[in-house]
Amino acid sequence: MIIYNVTINVSDEIHNQWIKWMKEDHIPKVLSTNLFVSASLNRIISNKDTGTTYAIAYKIESLSLLQKYETEFAPKLRNEYSSKFLDKAPAFRTIMQVEDKF
């Protein structure tokens, strides 16, 4: 199992708009690709930065499926995101492999 983690620091001035858009538009669009098993929206509570930081963890079965997402779907979805929020909610991505569950 692969976890595709997107970490985003959201400016206070757009927080409510951002959270609504992510829950009602962006995350459902990512899941509608039918490549991901699930997603969770997580608020990072140990962060001392200004604004609020979130980590969205998307679970996907394999790196090959993630590559398919990156090639076929991500460019359009990232463009939509960038046109709305990039300067007020920058994101970075981390890809993790689940080694074991307890």
Language-model region placement:
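Short N-terminal helix-initiation segments at or just after the protein's N-terminus
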Residues: M1-T7, L35-N42, A57, R78-L86
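Short, well-ordered beta-strand segments in beta-rich or mixed alpha/beta enzyme
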Residues: I3-N9, N42-E72
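A generic structural signal for alpha-helix starts
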Residues: D12-Q17, S64
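Short amphipathic alpha-helical segments
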Residues: H15-S40, K76-N79
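A broad, structure-centric signal for solvent-exposed, well-ordered loop/edge residues
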Residues: Q17, V37, S46-K48, Q67, ...
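A short, structured loop/turn motif at beta-sheet edges
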Residues: T33, E61-S64, K101
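Glycine-rich beta-strand-turn "strand-cap" elements at beta-sheet edges
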Residues: S40-D49, E80-F102
